[in-house]
Amino acid sequence: MANVGKVVQIVGAVLDVKFDSEQSLPNLLNALVIKLGDKEIVAEVAQHIGDDTVRCIAMSATDGLVRGMEVVDTGGPISVPVGDETLGRIFNVLGKPVDGKPAPKSAPKLPIHRPAPAYDELETTAEILETGIKVVDLLAPYLKGGKIGLFGGAGVGKTVLIQELINNIAKQHGGISVFSGVGERTREGNDLYGEMSESGVINKTALVFGQMNEPPGARMRVALTGLTMAEHFRDEQGQDVLLFVDNIFRFTQAGSEVSALLGRMPSAVGYQPTLATEMGALQERITSTKKGSITSVQAVYVPADDLTDPAPATTFSHLDAKTVLSRQISSLGIYPAVDPLESTSRILDPSIVGKEHYEVARGVQSILQRYKELQDIIAILGMDELSDEDKLIVARARKIQRFLSQSFTVAEQFTGNPGQYVPVKETVRGFKEILEGKHDDLPESAFLFVGTIEDAVRKAKGSM
């Protein structure tokens, strides 16, 4: 017989539900269902507050709910469809399709709350994941099965970079991607679906959205829905999966809204006291096992460009690589606007990427760092006051800066330039030649938005 309770209080997205006795109280994280006309509203148990009552977070709008309504305990957490039937489809936090097509019939279902893999299941070898994006592969390479943060303020190109990564991984590696849209613009989700359908990448991708207009409960759990789908591809099919989360900050933001509604004391800057725990529960499930891997790329919105804010700061501690997008670089018209000095990776290590790659990357960074130091002198005294050695460093640094730019396939319709995928070997060779001074005679404009070093030479010849 179904375990039934009654709604006794509704405060925004938070409901209190009273059951008959303590024995019939649903477990924490159980899904409860309320029938409202022909719709079902699902809520998740968050607290036992005494007096046979549980406090729950609704996963959809609570409009139309009234006290006294019947609530049925499903007996388990929210479960979502997984497997091949989810590819090419768009789902919400509950695993219900929102693309107007019928629900997957035979897809197995898994609960969104699951333990992280055990220690003895983890894979410990480090391997680089080639992205075909020069600045990323050279200076902050991605670890296969690692966690990567894309940091940047509003409008510096986080979403475009994510779309290019999905495109490159699907086309070059044939890998499966899962995209979790967490609290971002619905329009962007729609654009992403359209672009992926056009480029044919959609058949290798499952999309899950809990966008800005949805209640905090949905935004807080939608990352787990996407992660559960990715885990199935890793564990059951042995796939190397890419999990995109856009935006992980909204996950924290939704948690902070829910926390306040649940009556918890806020901690620093008004965030939830359980911030580190919630982030850890999500991040520890994203890992490589002996069966397959989940490589996660997470866009991290940085409130007011402040990297010390608790939300981005908590995210930092989980990451293997960080790609920092800079407004200063985008203002120079260099895209992707990745900051070559702020972006780092744990695997930029000669024992993993090789001695040549490591030395070229460090050489590029040291020249750019010296150029940064000289900029004040140039601004005050001008280029003529520099020594010949410093003039050469500035000239090479400006070429390197421009050679770090690249045309993206997903931006082709806006720029008119065809996108380029540059293998790591070509990237390292190109920058090595610039460092060695082989292209000191070329104008710096030849290096902007080209792929390989040969493209730059051809562009220079064409403009002469």
UniProtKB/Swiss-Prot annotation:
EC number: 7.1.2.2
Coiled-coil region(s): none
Gene3D superfamilies named among the record's database cross-references: 2.40.10.170, Bovine Mitochondrial F1-atpase, Atp Synthase Beta Chain, Chain D, domain 3 (1.10.1140.10), P-loop containing nucleotide triphosphate hydrolases (3.40.50.300)
InterPro entries attached to this UniProt entry: AAA+_ATPase (IPR003593), ATP-synt_VA_C (IPR055190), ATP_synth_F1_bsu (IPR005722), ATPase_a/bsu_AS (IPR020003), ATPase_alpha/beta_chains (IPR050053), ATPase_F1/V1/A1_a/bsu_N (IPR004100), ATPase_F1/V1/A1_a/bsu_N_sf (IPR036121), ATPase_F1/V1/A1_a/bsu_nucl-bd (IPR000194)
Keyword Transmembrane helix: no
Enzyme's top EC category: translocase
One cellular component (GO) term of this entry: plasma membrane
Presence of the UniProt keyword Cell membrane in the record: yes
Catalysed reaction, written as an equation: ATP + H2O + 4 H(+)(in) = ADP + phosphate + 5 H(+)(out)
Annotated residues for binding of ATP: 152-159
Protein origin, superkingdom: Bacteria
PANTHER family to which the protein is assigned, alphabetical: ATP SYNTHASE (PTHR15184), ATP SYNTHASE SUBUNIT BETA, MITOCHONDRIAL (PTHR15184:SF71)
Similarity remark: Belongs to the ATPase alpha/beta chains family.
Subunit structure: F-type ATPases have 2 components, CF(1) - the catalytic core - and CF(0) - the membrane proton channel. CF(1) has five subunits: alpha(3), beta(3), gamma(1), delta(1), epsilon(1). CF(0) has three main subunits: a(1), b(2) and c(9-12). The alpha and beta chains form an alternating ring which encloses part of the gamma chain. CF(1) is attached to CF(0) by a central stalk formed by the gamma and epsilon chains, while a peripheral stalk is formed by the delta and b chains.
Protein name: ATP synthase subunit beta
